[in-house]
Amino acid sequence: VIVCKHAPISQIQIKSAIKFWQNLGYRFENVKYKSDPTGACATEKPWGYIVIHLVDKETNLEPTALAQTHFFVDNLTGKINWATIKMRPDVRDTVLEHELGHALGFLHFNRIEHLMNQKWEMGGWDTLGLRASQR
């Protein structure tokens, strides 16, 4: 995971979000905060990384969306090769964890209080089905 230079994420926020997913059984290597030694932040396809950016004017973000994640799945292996997360400046609780969920391959699950609920107002911290051991 690389938090790019202008991403509206604090070091505490990324550490907390990573810990959240680690507690569900996921591993993250080489987490970088506003340091990009590989140049992953400058490419559209950051192979092997999840990169987090501030949303920009080129991003076609719906007016009600709080963030947007794109990920690339290799059709042969079924594995995610890279993901980009674009965040609005006003990051709300659960949004970073939700977007990391997309980067891990989870889609929306519209259950009340669930982390992956499409509507932030209806979501929460429920992690039903998100444990690495349940995949």
Q: Where do the protein language model's features map onto the residues?
A:
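Post-HEXXH active-site segment of zinc metalloproteases
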Residues: 106-130
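Fold-level signature of zinc-dependent metallopeptidase catalytic domains
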Residues: 1-15
